[in-house]
Regions:
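Lipolytic serine-hydrolase domain surface
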Residues: 2-40, 115, 124-127, 151-156, ...
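Well-ordered, non-membrane alpha-helical segments in soluble/globular domains
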Residues: 47-48, 77-90, 286-291, 388-392
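Short amphipathic alpha-helices and their capping/turn segments at secondary-structure boundaries
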Residues: 49-56, 294-295
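Short, surface-exposed "cap/lid" segments of acyl-processing enzymes
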Residues: 55-123, 144-191, 223
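N-terminal non-globular segments
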Residues: 61, 198-199, 241
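Conserved strand-to-helix beginnings and helix N-cap segments that scaffold or border functional pockets
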Residues: 76-80, 251, 319
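Acidic, His- and aromatic-enriched active-site or binding-groove loops in soluble protein domains
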Residues: 126-150
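Gly/Ala-rich beta-loop-alpha elbow adjacent to hydrolase catalytic centers
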Residues: 241-246, 250
Length: 401
């Protein structure tokens, strides 16, 4: 049993005469709640105000939006505004009948998704590199000895690490990655000096660091936030939507730590999720069940669980595979890449129903079911998920709850 007090306890006061009116985005009552790396509110007054506004509003539905990797508060709120712009268009038009009578409120959760040690990767100090290497490669004793001594690992060792991942079929192509991540030629050291090559590997290491942080925040502060919402608006349906590592965060909210009292959620929406495609999977032969399997078996989500996935997501295809391979995470099932991300192939071994998501898809969902939405036609890459038809799928999922 988890006996640690929530940092969110008693954070949902009843409204007072001095409470200010809620902020609106595209006509939706909206508030941002920012959490720190341990899941505690950065500004407890911000959380209290958001819950006070919910109590006043008495919404029928509360939608919690969660951003992914490498986002600031400003960029997260801009993304949330794009989601809600599409939602307003749909609720006022194509989906007006489906959502008639619903009173929405929206919480935008912001979490520290940029590693402190790598906020400026080109200026990372030796201490930063050591911390990131320890986080990403905990079982590589030879590598850790080098970085603890303040050295760049020798070229032979770096090449062995690279050989381990570039033999994967993922590297039969040479796609361009967003930002400054190198392609296969750069990984081989053909165009980069060894120090730059090592720094790029440390950038990948930060991917693993954020994976762990998202799960930790979801199981602590994110889960506490949902409980606060349910206290402030007890009749409201609560819907969670997460992108990238935000999908891992909201899945962790739904699962919770072992022994924690269960939550009930109305729907769960995972957009290009950065966790294993076996995360919801049943045990198969020697492979154990996925970490998030209890979300299904315990019927935490009364409505639909929607999972977008696409082969267009080269960032997940490559970065997730690299990080998982380096960290030694695997759940082998014969004939399937053990390191695949749910945002590339969907939820596997989970009894998911499959839809092709495009402008013409009718999108008829049922309660208590997980759906893989093949999104090649509407999601062009890892980051561009705030598309009209993605939001339409989310709202159609909400409409059946």
């Amino acid at each position: 049993m988890n006996t640690h007090p929530s940092p969110h306890a008693s954070a949902a006061p009843r409204p007072t005469a001095g409470s200010r009116a809620a902020r609106h985005l595209h006509g939706f009552p909206y508030a941002t709640v920012q959490l720190d790396r341990n899941g505690a509110p950065v500004d407890p007054a911000e959380l209290r105000q958001a819950m006070s506004e919910l109590s006043t509003l008495d919404p029928s539905d509360v939608l919690v939006l969660v951003h992914g990797w490498n986002a600031t508060r400003a960029s997260a709120e801009a993304r949330y505004g794009r989601y809600l712009g599409h939602a307003r268009t749909l609720i006022d038009g194509r989906l007006a009948q489906d959502l008639r009578g619903r009173r929405f409120a929206v919480i935008g959760l912001v979490w520290p998704s940029i590693p402190e040690s790598l906020q400026s990767p080109t200026d990372a100090s030796a201490d930063d590199v050591r911390a990131a290497a320890q986080e990403a490669f905990p079982h590589d004793a030879e590598l850790l000895r080098a970085v603890r001594a303040g050295q760049v690992p020798d070229r032979e060792h770096v090449e062995r690490l690279i050989d381990h991942v570039t033999e994967s079929e993922i590297f039969t192509q040479e796609p361009d990655l967003p930002g400054r991540e190198p392609g296969r030629a750069s990984l081989r050291g053909e165009a980069l000096d060894l120090g730059t090559l090592w720094r790029d590997i440390v950038v990948w290491a930060s991917y693993y660091e954020m994976r762990e942080r998202a799960g930790r925040i979801g199981e602590s502060g994110g889960r506490g936030l949902v409980r606060d919402i349910q206290k402030a608006a007890p009749s409201a349906r609560v819907h969670l939507l997460g992108h990238s590592f935000g999908a891992r965060l909201v899945a962790s909210v739904a699962r919770g730590p072992n022994g924690d009292p269960p939550l009930t959620l109305a729907s769960l929406h995972l957009l290009q999720g950065a966790f294993s495609h076996f995360g919801f999977g049943a045990a198969t032969g020697p492979a154990p069940e996925g970490y998030f399997r209890p979300v299904l078996t315990n019927r935490v989500v009364t409505g639909p669980i929607l999972v977008t996935h696409t082969g267009n997501d080269l960032a997940l295809s490559i970065l997730y595979t690299l990080a998982s391979t380096f960290a030694g995470h695997t759940r082998s099932v014969r004939g399937v890449n053990p390191f695949g991300a749910i945002g590339v192939t969907g939820a596997l071994n989970a009894g998911a129903q499959r839809f092709v998501l495009d402008a013409a898809a009718p999108l008829t969902f049922g309660n208590g079911q997980i759906y893989n939405l093949q999104s090649d036609a509407v999601i062009p890459n890892h980051g561009d998920v705030e598309q009209l038809d993605v939001v339409r799928a989310v709202l159609r999922g909400i409409s059946v709850t």
